[in-house]
Swiss-Prot record:
The active site is at residue 157. GO terms for molecular function: N-acetyl-gamma-glutamyl-phosphate reductase activity; NAD binding; NADP+ binding. Its EC number is 1.2.1.38. It comes from Bifidobacterium longum (strain DJO10A). The gene is argC. This is N-acetyl-gamma-glutamyl-phosphate reductase. It is found in: Cytoplasm. Belongs to the NAGSA dehydrogenase family. Type 1 subfamily. The lineage of its organism: Bacteria, Bacillati, Actinomycetota, Actinomycetes, Bifidobacteriales. It catalyses: N-acetyl-L-glutamate 5-semialdehyde + phosphate + NADP(+) = N-acetyl-L-glutamyl 5-phosphate + NADPH + H(+). It is an enzyme of class 1 (oxidoreductase). SUPFAM superfamilies: Glyceraldehyde-3-phosphate dehydrogenase-like, C-terminal domain, NAD(P)-binding Rossmann-fold domains.
Length: 364
């Protein structure tokens, strides 16, 4: 079978670059176009020397004319840019937006955290997201919405870690919807590729940790709450039933997110043993190949998942505090962005879900 042709916009950024790295080794895709803005006319050998397969490609302008004509189009653009471009793209192409423009279902949430034009919600690209329960008690998942779709919204990286950590407890009614707290240690690539920001310079970043977007202002908050609502079997319009204290902290590492998410135990949870609570997480991720619930007593570490599409998970209880603590470690560029996007793209095209992906990290 002929390979699917792929165009990547935002090809010289971190997210676009990771998409290119994964797609270059994928057996079913052929990268035939790379597009950018400030780097137009430059060789990819300059920008992505670690991907020698791209050395002969030259960065083209990000226009519909350049992107159309390919089977798959990956948009790794700032929020606002993808939405403006998307309506001009071939309706028969599969378009994956790695940005925020098509993630949120409710315009009120978009207006509060982003502002500007609100674009239509696309099929959400988190296959493992719990979306409710079937009549037999098994979980329904977002995976079922992906086959055949032509438009995919890639989740945020912090959203991915926070959602995967806590959603089993939400789905089974083990945690209260109020007073959820998430503290995330985030690698500097999560802040994007911006040489104008002095806090991203090595002299500023090395040996320093820096909180950012604090006080309920981080733009990933409404997306996390939307996912929590779905995990509880509710609609996005009911996301306001959940409250989240969210603090991301930039740490001196290039990749990785370690999410520590805690929530008050419900009366139901208090009747369960620690082993029974752990069994809830085990059941929730049974058969989800990229989800790794670590052995009891082993906590996730970002160094173990670099370069992989896996999420390393753990859950513990603090009976004195009356809280459940859920942990997730992911590679923010792979599982948190491009890897998850390729996983969703595989499903949309009817390819093996794990094609071109690995759950084996690079360590040390």
């Amino acid at each position: 079978m002929a390979k699917y042709t792929v165009a990547v916009a935002g090809a010289t950024g971190y997210a676009g670059g990771e998409a290119l790295r994964i797609l270059a080794a994928h057996p079913d895709f052929d990268i035939t176009c790379v597009a950018g803005h400030s780097s137009v006319g430059e060789s990819m050998a300059k920008h992505m020397p670690h991907i020698p397969q791209l050395a002969n490609l030259v960065v083209e302008d990000t226009t519909p004319e350049v992107l159309n004509g390919h089977d798959v189009i990956i948009l790794a653009l700032p929020h606002g840019a993808s939405g403006k471009l998307a309506s001009q793209l071939d309706p028969n192409a599969v378009v994956v937006d790695l940005g925020a423009d098509h993630r949120l279902e409710e315009q009120a949430a978009w207006d509060e955290f982003y502002g500007g034009d609100f674009y239509e919600h696309w099929t959400y690209g988190m296959p493992e997201l719990i979306t409710g329960k079937a009549a037999d008690g098994s979980y329904t998942r977002q995976r079922a919405a992906l086959p055949g779709t032509k438009r995919i919204a890639g989740p945020g990286c912090n959203v991915t870690a926070t959602t995967l950590a806590l959603q089993p407890g939400i789905a089974e009614g083990l945690v209260e919807s109020q007073d959820i707290v998430a503290d995330l240690v985030v690698g500097y690539s999560g802040a994007g590729k911006n040489l104008k920001r002095t806090n991203l310079l090595a002299a500023e970043a090395l040996q320093s940790a820096l909180p950012y977007s604090v006080g309920g202002k981080h733009r990933h908050i409404p997306e996390i709450l939307q996912n929590f609502a779905h995990a509880a079997g509710k609609s996005a319009a009911e996301a306001s039933e959940f409250t989240l204290g969210f603090t991301p902290i930039l740490a001196p590492m290039s990749r990785g997110i370690l999410a520590t998410v805690s929530a008050r135990m419900t009366d139901k949870a208090k009747t369960l043993s620690d082993e029974e609570i752990r069994a809830v997480w085990s059941k929730a991720y049974e058969g989800q190949d990229f989800m790794v619930l670590l052995p009891e007593g082993t906590l996730p570490a970002t160094g173990n998942i670099i370069g992989s599409n896996a999420a390393h998970l753990q859950v513990v209880t603090d009976r004195k505090a009356g809280r459940i603590y859920a942990f997730a470690a992911i590679d923010n560029l792979n599982r948190g962005t491009a890897g998850q996007a390729v996983q969703s793209l595989n499903i949309a095209l009817g390819l093996p879900e794990d094609a071109g992906l690995t759950k084996i990290g690079v360590a040390p």
